[in-house]
Every structure is written in C-alpha cells, then in structure tokens.
C-alpha cells in the first residue's frame, strides 16, 4: 500500500516520471524507509537509490504547506533535503531542495545509458526543483564534479580518456530546455569553459545539443600529439588568448565536436 501510494504521488507531480520500490517500511520518528528505489522518465531509468528515509515535519500539517525531510544513499555517496508541498488543491505548487555529497555518477544510469561516452566522477552540489499547478517543472542547480574522467569509445588524438581535477557548473531547467549557464573545468590535459542549451527529447538520448566554449590544452598534452598536429594548434593558441573556441552539436548519444 505504501509503495502504491508513493508511485501515485510521483505521477501526480509529473506523469512523465515513475518510481519503482523494492521495499518500504515505516520508521520512528514517524516516517518511511524505502530501499532499492528506481526513478524513471518514461521507460528510461534515471537514478537508482540504495535507501531513502522520508519524514514529515508534524507541525507543518497545521499549516498551508506540508514539509518533508529526507536523507538517502546512492552511488556510494549521500543526499539530503526538504520537500515543500502546498495543501491547497487549487495551488498544486511544490518545491524540493536537495544537497548532493560525493555521488559517483558512474553508478547513475541517467549519466551512462544515453551516450557513447562513459563519465565518472564524484558529484556534489545543490539542486532546487519547482513544480507549478500545471505539469511544468523548473529547476536550478549549482554542481561540482571532482576527480572526473570522460572515456571515449575510440581514441581521440591518441587519448582513451580525459581526466579533470574538477568541473563546476550552474544549470537551469525550464520545461524541455536545459541551459548550462556557466561551466568551467580544470583537467590534466586541458582547461576550459562551456555553456549553451540542451533541448530534452524522448527518448532522452535524442536530446539535441547546442553547446559552445573554449579549451586551453596543456603544453605537455600538445607535445604528445606529435609535431604535425602541434604545429597546427600552436598558431591558433597564440592568437586566441582564452583558448580555442569549439562547438558541440548533435545529440546526447552522438555528440559532434568541432573547432
């Protein structure tokens, strides 16, 4: 009964999302513990959650807005936050604040299943999700990815992967439009920035990319490319103080990179 009620509540927030729960048990203080939870968008798995505990703030039942606190584990890391749900049926507004702490994205299906490029790293940050009376969701996130690695399906410039000390970014979501407002990365081979728009589609891997930015290759990386490629890049780097401009087009499953 608990699992069915939760699944119904999720579908009421947005019919495109569903939740599957392996086990649900009550806990004290009054609340619920869910184990082996999978969150899906349409038929695509986005997140696998090992465990999450949800507890209501009992005094909030006397107010126009009910508050729930939650803590959980996923991807070897942790998350916590609060959900604010309006009790007015005519309002239908809700908000969720989420704090992420060193979650390994290699274990998150939503990061792995929709692209040929394998991504790894420890994700931390804050996410705020808002839902209006209509089935419209907006979100804002400030995120940090530490010890990150992007592995290519086949070598690029002789590299099997790119590794980064950190990637920091600000992301917003309005309906199907995801905007990377600013993102900086510091890596072992290249540094740079990226921004732009991702138009979300169904299936998710068909989402279109309109991204651009700049990269500044490290000198030892340029040297490793060989004299031919290095001789082509060095004049461009000398004339571009902020690095080489690039674009990424195509889709999540098949991104196209160009200088």
Q: Over which residues does each language-model region extend?
A:
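Generic short beta-strand segments
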Residues: 35-39, 100-106, 144-150, 216
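Amphipathic hydrophobic-ligand
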Residues: 43-54, 73-82, 110-129, 158-169, ...
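Short "repeat-start/strand-capping" segments in structured domains, especially the N-termini
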Residues: 66-67, 120, 136-139, 198
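Short, solvent-exposed aromatic-acidic interface loops
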Residues: 71-75, 143-149, 184-188, 214-218
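Terminal hydrophobic membrane-targeting helix
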Residues: 1-81
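Beta-propeller and related beta-repeat scaffolds in trafficking/envelope systems
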Residues: 22, 44-59, 136, 140-177, ...
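Transmembrane beta-strands of outer-membrane beta-barrel proteins
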Residues: 68, 94-96, 139-141, 211
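Acidic, Ser/Thr- and Pro/Gly-rich intrinsically disordered regions
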Residues: 54, 65-68, 77, 105-110, ...
